């Protein structure tokens, strides 16, 4: 999965982009914070699974 697609998925599921510095987006939902780096590449499968698990999308 591309990092842009992951960012889009999180935004569609209620996460808000509260801050961006360079290519790093800080997303927030219900006192949870997740940082997604958007470099135009595929997200490694282990990192993708960890992010999806922490954001309760998996």
What are these model-derived regions, one by one?
Residues 22:
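Cytochrome P450 catalytic-core helices
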């Amino acid at each position: 999965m591309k990092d842009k697609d992951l960012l889009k998925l999180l935004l569609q599921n209620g996460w808000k982009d509260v801050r961006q510095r360079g290519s790093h987006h800080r997303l927030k939902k219900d006192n949870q914070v997740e940082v997604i780096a958007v470099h135009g590449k595929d997200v490694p499968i282990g990192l993708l699974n960890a992010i999806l698990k922490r954001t309760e999308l998996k």
